[in-house]
Amino acid sequence: MPRVNLLNYNFNALVMLVCSYLVLFSEVEISTNVFFVILFSFAVIQKSFNYKYKKLFSSILAIATIYILFVLNDQTLSKEYFINLILGLIFLKYSEIEKKENHYFFGFSCVFLAVSSLIYGQDLISSFLSFIIILLSIIHLYSLNQTK
């Protein structure tokens, strides 16, 4: 039976990514959820490949993500748009992680999303998931600083 190792920073990053999506799952429309699932799938697949122009491709996709989320939010700049934008950019940042040093910005972005979600959404499930993200981020940063 496989054991869950909370000090494995790659596993923590994936769990934080899933929790980040689940925080906003109930607060966005179906079309935005479909876009997030596609972006999540892309992030997981791209992280597994290592090719030369990964950051360039992610940058182009980030610009497209900003535009697509703007259109999905009825071309309105609102707090929902910016919180959705943070989640989209977290997905793209996860796909760019290659080295241990790249995990720091990802962890801080997840904490920012969790705190923003706590301010924006006050339901119990969202608050619990935000707490899980913050707790996992602390464990994640601790495991990144460990030397073996």
Regions found by a protein language model. Name each.
Residues 1-148:
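Linear, non-domain "peripheral" regions
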